[in-house]
Design a protein with these regions (language model features):
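Carbohydrate-active catalytic/glycan-binding domains of CAZyme proteins
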Residues: 1-170
Length: 170
């Protein structure tokens, strides 16, 4: 249940591949150490959104088996991956998953980030004024060190699940 999608890049196809801090993508230990060391830009993580009709079955976990694709007609990039769900996860049956697509967007320094929503064919439009961005937002920061392992706290919440923080812009 601990799949993670992390980003590294290189100036050469042959490498070396590094993260934003210059850490190498290659791990030399018995177990990959991206999680412990926090290497690589984490594009997705286990998350449970607040509000709406979401139930525990909607807690997204274990995003992985991904591909990045570039659409030739306009150069837009997309992340295609699978995700599993906390309440549908069991050690004996790990085949219940859904395929998802998110657009990849560049930051000002050229790194890619995944849009926070599934791609449904729409095109994002940049805001033109402060009125375009006022309101309440739920923001999830993808903790570099968390992962879903199926364990629950005494209150029923899952260990390793990122929760949103609410921000209001006036």
């Amino acid at each position: 249940g601990g799949y993670q999608i992390r980003l590294f890049r290189s100036k050469s196809l042959l490498g070396p591949y590094v993260d934003q801090n210059g850490n190498p993508a290659i791990s030399y230990g018995e177990i990959p150490d991206n999680q412990e060391r926090g290497t690589g830009i984490r594009l997705t993580s286990s998350v449970q959104w607040d509000g709406g009709p979401a139930e525990l079955a909607d807690v997204e976990v274990s995003q992985g088996h991904n591909s990045a694709i570039r659409r030739s007609k306009d150069g837009r990039m997309f992340l295609v991956y699978h995700t599993r769900f906390a309440e549908r996860f069991s050690e004996g049956d790990d085949e219940d998953y859904e395929s998802h697509v998110r657009e990849l967007l560049p930051t000002s320094d050229g790194w890619l980030v995944a849009a926070p929503y599934e791609y449904r064919g729409s095109v994002a439009v940049a805001p033109t004024g402060i009125a375009d961005i006022t309101g309440d937002y739920n923001v999830v920061l993808h903790d570099q060190h968390t992962f879903f392992n199926g364990k629950q706290e005494d209150d029923g919440t899952y260990v390793g699940i990122n929760r949103p923080t609410r921000y209001t812009f006036h």
